[in-house]
């Protein structure tokens, strides 16, 4: 009795549909899908600069250390 069977979940689903209606549930589903899509797009833009940082660190290793000379005499 610790877990719910499929019949318990179906009864809960019917009650939720009666309380909220199918139109509101559809709107909630669309909003949730849009939020997930926005999160995935945000993660893609976050990962792109990381690749650019790796490329710039590879070029930074090719720099040469020099000493500056005093040009003011």
From Swiss-Prot:
Keywords: Cell inner membrane, Cell membrane, Membrane, Protein transport, Translocation, Transmembrane, Transmembrane helix, Transport. Residues 50-73 are annotated as: Disordered. Signal peptide: none annotated. Its main location: membrane. The chain crosses the membrane at residues 1-21. Residues 62-73 have a biased composition (Basic and acidic residues). One of its GO terms (molecular function) is protein transmembrane transporter activity. NCBIfam families: PRK02958.1, tatAE. Belongs to the TatA/E family. The Tat system comprises two distinct complexes: a TatABC complex, containing multiple copies of TatA, TatB and TatC subunits, and a separate TatA complex, containing only TatA subunits. Substrates initially bind to the TatABC complex, which probably triggers association of the separate TatA complex to form the active translocon. This is Sec-independent protein translocase protein TatA.
């Amino acid at each position: 009795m610790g877990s719910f069977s499929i019949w318990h979940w179906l009864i809960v689903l019917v009650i939720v549909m009666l309380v909220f209606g199918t139109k509101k549930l559809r709107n909630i589903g669309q909003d949730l899908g849009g939020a997930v899509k926005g999160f995935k797009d945000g993660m893609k833009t976050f990962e792109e600069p990381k690749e650019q940082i790796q490329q710039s660190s590879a070029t930074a290793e090719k720099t040469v250390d020099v000493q500056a000379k005093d040009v003011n005499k």
